[in-house]
């Protein structure tokens, strides 16, 4: 007698299972769906019970849609980390070979703390099978192209094609570029040579660095509020500080992370929604800029890989000008200290934030427009302001300032002002830590450093009352009245500050009088 139990069991791929679930969701009767797909009612019930698991696999794209078994890898967290990295590389249209994937797997395994993991050919084959990845051989020509960058032909092709389509529906006022830079905020002129070329992945210098995100539009009419990332979430110098000229966040590396960038993006998107605007945001494809959230008012355009040095406006002089202005602020502070009896103190985070923000807002619209034109992203006719050279910012006065401070602080003769400005250009601003952060269960690797970690210990500043602030403005006004050729704009700004303070103090007095009146009733 034939054994009826020998009927071959059918296996369904993830894609087929989702189709079954989708059929039930569409309103079809379960019995009809079971007949349509040739499955038993119990199998259908199992599919429906496991739908959350299927949806999670689809959302994470951690299993190829044609794969029928969903057994996890032996080193599941390594597998997920490598696949997350692969998705980022694939999104950048970068070709990778099996050997590259194996090397990356070993690197990520080491970051996750695995010493015995072996990225063998067998592991690679199983990894490819799990995720439905088809690797193609990379010919010598492709390899050379990847190693040498896209080349001038690819850049010209981007200028003539993709960027024209991207900017077609936007005016220069609504085309933005965002980018990050590292800042050694406590760098002194005499330490320039020691800092230059330091990537600062960790160690003592990591406590002396910040990462700053800047964003501006192509017309030079709008610069967004900077985002500064430090190591300490609650530095002592920010105690009782409720208003800053920038947004401040923290993690243990003082790097830009995916979560921080996405938070910033969502805030900008909400602001554009309130203003009923739509903007184009051009960014590079570093690891912190991948896996973006849903945006309603921002269209994101990625600059071609390996070309940001010639295509990213902020990299073509805008950030450099900001650093020139920041370092000039720092030099003035040093000179004032040298000219007084006060001890030379290192800059704290609050002072650095104030100087970075002041430098950013001081970058001229003409400098911004010049750099956008240099990138070739907007036509020349869009520029309606004086496009003076961006290199004109470090003028004679700043060079004299540098020379004076350099002599007083014994700076080596071979170090010049440009060395001082560019000493932190090689700082890392993001890394694969986003991937590792997602993999490590129960350990938040983006956690900010402890309070005051690495911070300069300065005396706590006394809280200034509003009456003292008003008195200070009056003293400043008195001082300016004794000077010659003070621009009208200075008096206008002073009047604005005075008006704001008087409005606050009068409102406080009015509120207190009303409270007193109500309490007597």
Curated annotation (Swiss-Prot):
Any one annotated GO CC term: nucleus
UniProt-recorded Gene Ontology molecular function terms: DNA binding
Record domain HTH CENPB-type: where: 66-137
DDE-1 domain location: 170-372
Keywords attached to this entry: DNA-binding, Nucleus
SMART domains registered for this protein in UniProt: CENPB
DNA-binding region in chain numbering: 30-50, 99-130
Residues in HTH psq-type domain copies: 3-54
Pfam family, one: CENP-B_N
Subcellular location: Nucleus
InterPro entries named among the record's database cross-references: CenT-Element_Derived, DDE_SF_endonuclease_dom, Homeodomain-like_sf, HTH_CenpB_DNA-bd_dom, HTH_Psq
Similarity comment: Belongs to the tigger transposable element derived protein family.
PANTHER family reported in the protein's UniProt record: TIGGER TRANSPOSABLE ELEMENT-DERIVED PROTEIN 6 (PTHR19303:SF52), TRANSPOSON (PTHR19303)
Protein name: Tigger transposable element-derived protein 6
UniProt organism field: Homo sapiens (Human)
Gene from which this protein is expressed: TIGD6
């Amino acid at each position: 007698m034939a054994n009826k139990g020998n009927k071959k069991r059918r296996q369904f791929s993830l894609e087929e299972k989702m189709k079954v679930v989708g059929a039930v969701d569409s309103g079809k009767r379960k019995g009809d769906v079971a007949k349509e797909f040739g499955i038993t009612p119990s199998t259908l019930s199992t599919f429906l019970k496991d739908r959350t698991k299927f949806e999670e696999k689809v959302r994470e794209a951690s299993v190829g849609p044609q794969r029928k078994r969903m057994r996890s890898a032996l080193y599941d967290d390594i597998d997920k980390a490598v696949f997350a990295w692969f998705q980022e590389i694939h999104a950048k249209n970068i070709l990778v070979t099996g050997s590259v994937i194996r090397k990356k797997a070993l690197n990520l395994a080491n970051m996750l703390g695995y010493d015995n993991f072996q990225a063998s050919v067998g592991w690679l084959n199983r990894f490819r099978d799990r995720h439905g990845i088809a690797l193609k051989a990379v010919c010598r020509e492709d390899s050379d192209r990847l190693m040498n960058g896209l080349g001038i032909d690819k850049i010209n092709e981007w200028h003539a094609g993709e960027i024209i389509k991207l900017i077609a529906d936007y005016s220069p006022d609504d085309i933005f570029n965002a980018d990050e830079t590292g800042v050694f905020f406590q760098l002194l002129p005499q330490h320039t040579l020691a800092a230059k070329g330091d990537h600062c992945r960790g160690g003592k210098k990591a406590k002396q660095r910040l990462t700053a995100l800047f964003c501006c539009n192509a017309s030079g009419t709008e610069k967004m509020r900077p985002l500064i990332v430090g190591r300490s979430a609650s530095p002592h110098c920010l105690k009782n500080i409720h208003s800053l000229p920038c947004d401040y966040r923290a993690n243990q590396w003082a790097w830009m992370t995916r979560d921080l960038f996405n938070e910033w993006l969502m805030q900008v998107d909400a602001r554009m929604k309130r203003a009923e605007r739509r903007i184009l945001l051009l960014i590079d494809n570093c690891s912190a800029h991948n896996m973006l959230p849903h945006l309603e008012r921002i269209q994101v355009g990625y600059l071609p890989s390996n070309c940001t040095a010639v295509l990213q406006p902020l990299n073509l002089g805008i950030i450099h000008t900001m650093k020139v202005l920041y370092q000039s602020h720092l030099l003035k502070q040093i000179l004032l200290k040298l000219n007084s009896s006060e001890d030379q103190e290192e800059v704290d985070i609050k002072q650095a934030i104030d100087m970075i923000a002041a430098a950013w807002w001081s970058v001229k619209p003409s400098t911004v427009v010049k750099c956008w034109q240099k990138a070739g992203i907007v036509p020349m006719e869009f520029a309606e302001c004086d496009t003076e050279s961006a290199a004109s910012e470090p003028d004679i006065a700043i060079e004299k300032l540098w020379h004076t401070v350099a002599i007083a602080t014994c700076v080596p003769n071979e170090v010049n002002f440009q060395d001082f400005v560019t000493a932190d250009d090689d700082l890392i601003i993001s890394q694969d830590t986003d991937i590792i952060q997602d993999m490590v269960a129960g350990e938040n690797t983006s956690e900010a450093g402890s309070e005051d970690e690495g911070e300069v210990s300065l005396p706590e500043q006394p809280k200034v009352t509003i009456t003292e602030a008003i008195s200070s403005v009056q003293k400043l006004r008195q001082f300016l009245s004794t000077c010659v050729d003070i621009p009208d704009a200075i008096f206008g700004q002073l009047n604005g500050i005075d008006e704001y303070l008087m409005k606050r103090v009068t409102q406080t007095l009015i509120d207190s009088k009303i409270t007193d009146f109500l309490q007597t009733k």
